Amino acid sequence: MSSPLSQLIADLSSADESKKLAAASEIYRLGRATAGSAVAGWWTESELSALLLGPSPAITVGVAVQRDTFSRIRIANGTPRLVGVPPDQDAEEFELEFPEGAALDILTAREPGGSGAIAKYLAKFGEGIQQVEYRCTNVDRASQILKEKFKVASVYPETRAGADGTRVNFFLVKSPDGGKVLIELYELPSRA
């Protein structure tokens, strides 16, 4: 028997467009809700809120899936372009955007049994919402505010290269239910 989230992930590869949209919308809602409760206090800090494009932040929910699921979802959605993930991250990714604002990144390990973050997540938890991504205008400054004012340490000591030339850092944030949520802050490449 599969979990409701497993069924939603499977429905992303449905030929029925309304079923696919309903699944994407629900996965997006679940990701936003999980992250929203974990980062609620961030919006009280005016500079951080502005850096994260508050009060209406650009949010993408990252869904980690096995390679076969990745292929099925990609084919069912018109074979979207693979984004350029740095090789050291051992991941493949494509983006899906749906009506009503649902944005998903579908992620998998580049190599079965790999050693990257996605492979480790899949080995430990199976398919699911792996991260929630917030677009940010300055990841370095946001990271500094999170460290100084919220005592939230970044996963990496420095901002690093992300997919398609973005700059990223990650934060493992405690949620009110005692769990943890992986938050990615990403900064779009400058148009030089």
Language model segments and positions:
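Glycine-rich, mobile lid/loop segments that gate access to catalytic sites or pores
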Residues: 114
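Amphipathic alpha-helical segments
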Residues: 65-81, 140-151
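Surface-exposed beta-strand edges and their flanking turn/coil or helix-capping segments
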Residues: 76, 118-122, 147, 169
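N-terminal domain-onset segments
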Residues: 40, 45-77
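Vicinal oxygen chelate
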Residues: 1-68, 83-87, 92-107, 118-141, 144-192
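Short, structured motif recognition centered on aromatic/hydrophobic residues
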Residues: 57-61, 73, 101-109, 118, ...
